[in-house]
Amino acid sequence: MSTTFDKDQENEQQQQDAQAIWKKILSPGARITKDDVDFAIDNLESAPDVPYEFMYATFSPNAKIYQPTAIAVSGVGGIIGALLALKRALQYGGPKYYVTTEEVIKATDQKSPLYLANYALNRLLKAYPAQVVVIKPDDFDKIKTLLSSGGVYISGLPYETLIPISQLSGFGRIWHYSPIQKKFFVF
């Protein structure tokens, strides 16, 4: 017969296990696997709350910070940051868009370096539905739409796409996750 005390201990053990797995996933240089992506999506509520630093605070202290509503799921390096940005977005009404590239959409071969991003995107669409925006460097109308909805988490996007986004963004809209410092930088 299970008691309330036993259930409390079991819940506490599950929380400790989840925290240990998150710590492993978030460690700098961690090799992210499909199992890590599954765990992170299935246990998003137990993910740590990651702080952010506004990089222009010294010369624009009154700039508005726009919470991320568009989440880039486009490269291996940005997947875990994308999930942390998603957790933040869920606290402010959820994501409106997942931003990706044609290369990620086509990466269905498990040997492809972009397969994990494709897998994560498909899992996210089932768990946390949002519109998918496939972006190219010269898609200025799409970029304006993304920026008009709020902040954009950009880690993992190709550099040729980052430049036009950053040029059109203004202050407080661009989010980047640093696994070394374990925080978001907002530009």
UniProtKB/Swiss-Prot annotation:
It is a single-pass membrane protein. Keywords: Host membrane, Membrane, Transmembrane, Transmembrane helix, Virion. The keyword Cell division does not apply. The chain crosses the membrane at residues 65-85. GO terms for cellular component: host cell membrane; membrane; virion component. It is found in: Host membrane; Virion. This is Structural protein ORF187.
